[in-house]
Amino acid sequence: SIDDLAQSADAIRRQQTSLGRWARDTLPADAIIGVNDTGAIAFFSGRRTFDVVGLTTKSEPRYWAAGAGSRFEHYERMPQGALPTHFIVYPEWMAVPQIIGEELASRTVNATILGGKTMTASVASYDVLRSAEEPLGETRGELIDRLDVADLESEADHGYALFWATQAQNRVHEAWLADRRRADGGRAGRTLERFTIKLRPSATLVARLIVETPMTLDLWVDGQKLAPVSVSADPEWQEVALRLPAEVGDKPAKIELAAP
């Protein structure tokens, strides 16, 4: 009806249009605004936008479809100058609070036409990007190879088997390690991991895991079953290190890690 149309237009005016005008009047001319509902904000702000959903930024749809952890990993690969300087988003859509900094403004409007009740404008914060790229436990030495789970490019390079992976299970995980906040993309709900990674004889294989109950994991390297891996329950991640046998070849190997 005409009344519904008028109410919807007014809701957009009070939320998205209002924040777009706020951005025009407040943010620097060279600001890049990360958005997840792009129309009115892009039009009224007059600022360059970065559409995290990908409707108007063509590089982004596959990362949005994959899940929050893959978007976080993708942002780690991007040049700093290409990342948004600010976000005007529905926070529950964004699902990566680790990169949302100080809130500058918000508009709360209750209307079904909108993507959410509250849309917020915030400074972007990238302190946690690349904060967990290396092993963070006691294991040190030359890095031979690395599979970065949820990083779509790394998964493809290592033949990572997705199995039953879902978007909802693709998350950003946090931990406080070595006196700073760390974050890493990952996939939850896994009971079987299968991938290929470069090895060397007597090298140490390090796996970063989150385990809800203590268990023993089975490990295979190129079809050879090695000693079981015991892990404890920890709501944050833990790193398990396993010394590989001397007979392991200096080549890519197929790894399988399985929970009971």
For each predicted feature, which ranges?
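Transmembrane alpha-helical segments
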Residues: 1-11, 48-51, 55
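C-terminal luminal/periplasmic domains and tails of membrane-associated envelope-modifying transferases
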Residues: 15-31, 35-36, 40-43, 52, ...
